[in-house]
Design a protein with these regions (language model features):
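Divalent metal-coordination and catalytic microenvironments
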Residues: 41, 75, 104-105, 154, ...
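Acidic, His/Gly-rich catalytic cores of divalent-metal-dependent hydrolytic chemistry
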Residues: 187-381
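Active-site neighborhood of divalent metal-dependent phosphoester bond hydrolases
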Residues: 67, 80-225
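Active-site-proximal beta-strand elements of phosphoester/diester hydrolases
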Residues: 35-43, 166-172, 330-332
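Active-site environment of divalent metal-dependent phosphoester hydrolases
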Residues: 45-46, 78-81, 106-112, 161, ...
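A short acidic-Thr-Gly-centered motif at the start of a beta-strand
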Residues: 23-32, 63, 88-95, 159-162, ...
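Residue-level marker for buried hydrophobic side chains located in beta-strands
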Residues: 38, 70-72, 101-102, 167, ...
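N-terminal active-site segment of His-dependent metallophosphoesterases
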Residues: 3-88
Length: 381
């Protein structure tokens, strides 16, 4: 079955900063009722998405014969071959009421105008690395006339979806951030992010951290500029990083919370002084949480680790495992975002996968058709 995409200019748009956009949904919104299929981080892997939808029983318009509906956990786009096709398909499915989609950190990076090589398919389509022979020559670039619609769509996405039996978020169920968003109304993700950024930067300036951070960056400029620099742990830079993460509700829900690193490490083109806080180890609520973001492995035998940042989970955890003291948190990101690395090595048999968690069945389905009965610490309907 062919699942195709086409632009959907007929969506109902309003105006925001001169950009046509869909109306804003609440930041904390109600999840679909009934049976749903929660799809992990797609990262521009359109063929994997197409294969997974077939395995789940959806037609090319996102309809299911049993009335099931889709929820995308975020990170639609990245270094996969066809981020535009993924975004277009999801936009259409959301507009038709057949899917919901959360904001992921990769969509947030595009919204706030970050300049990273992994975003060049969108921010700099003419870059040499996107041309034949370049590092990202495999990536289809965004059609220029669709940029505004993509940004508008990302700006309108909820950050949290919830219902009585389930919570959905891209990276972290962080109560302080969620409470703040409940009170925020519907200003849009970019406006929320910018307001938090302005408040945080003012506080850092007042505390003198901004000046100390600048001094550390200047003193260690050569070490910070590339992945081989091995800078020391810089206290002002670390504190600034933590505040920009933990005090910004949009960021902490899409990137996950940070804590002070034991030593600096280099990932996503920069040195980090903070590392991931394993928040799931302290989650004691009864309501299950499904998230993405954390580059989980599907295979656990030696030599099958997906290329990624430092591992977030016990590397021996298999795909059936739930996390947390009550075993009621599930990460549905099975590292398909690293498939571009596998291709660069000439691999055609992939160890990274795109998965979906079927709710309430608690079954994992991956794009190859493998079905895994997961093992939650609760009884699901």
């Amino acid at each position: 079955m062919a699942i195709r995409w086409t632009p959907h200019p007929s969506l109902a748009f309003t105006e925001f900063r001169g950009i046509a956009m869909t109306g804003f949904a609440p930041c904390v919104a109600a999840a679909f009722d009934g049976p749903i299929d929660i799809i992990g981080d797609v990262h521009g892997e359109y063929d994997a998405l197409r294969a997974l939808l077939v395995q789940l029983g959806y037609d090319d318009e996102g309809r299911h014969p049993e009335g099931r509906r889709l929820v995308f956990i975020g990170d639609l786009c990245d270094r996969g071959p066809d981020s535009p096709a993924v975004v277009e398909w999801v936009m259409a499915a959301v507009a038709a009421g057949r899917a919901q989609c959360l904001l992921g950190n990769h969509e947030l990076l595009l919204l706030v105008g970050e300049s990273r090589e992994s975003l060049r398919w969108f921010i700099d389509p003419s870059h040499a690395e996107l041309q034949p022979g370049g590092k990202y020559a495999h990536c289809r670039v965004v059609p220029p006339e669709r940029k505004a619609a993509y940004l508008a769509f990302f700006d309108s996405l909820p950050l949290v979806l919830e219902r009585p039996d389930l919570r959905l978020v891209h990276a972290a169920w962080w109560p302080a951030a969620i409470d703040a968003l409940r009170a925020a109304g519907t200003p849009g993700n970019l406006a929320l992010y910018e307001a938090a950024t302005q408040r945080i930067e003012t506080q850092l300036e007042v505390r003198g951290i901004t000046q100390r951070e600048a001094e550390e960056r200047s003193e260690h400029a050569d070490q910070l500029k590339d992945g081989q620099g091995n800078p020391p742990l810089l206290p002002a830079l670390a504190e600034a990083n933590l505040r920009r993460n933990l005090d910004n509700a949009v960021r902490v829900l899409t990137f996950g919370p940070d804590c002070l690193a034991t030593r600096p490490y280099y990932v996503m083109e920069r040195w980090r002084m903070a590392e991931r806080d394993r928040w799931w180890e302290r989650y004691t609520d009864d309501v299950p949480v499904v998230m993405g973001h954390y580059w989980r492995k599907f295979e656990t035998s030696p030599g099958t680790a997906a290329p990624s940042m430092p591992p977030s989970f016990d590397p021996t955890l298999g795909p059936s495992a739930w996390l947390g003291p009550k075993r009621n948190i599930y990460c549905v990101d099975f590292s398909v975002g690293a498939r571009f690395v596998e291709r660069s090595r000439g691999q055609t048999q992939f160890r990274t996968h795109l998965g979906a968690l079927r709710w309430p069945e608690c079954q994992l389905v991956i794009e190859t058709g493998v079905v895994v009965a997961t093992e939650p610490g609760f009884v699901s309907g």
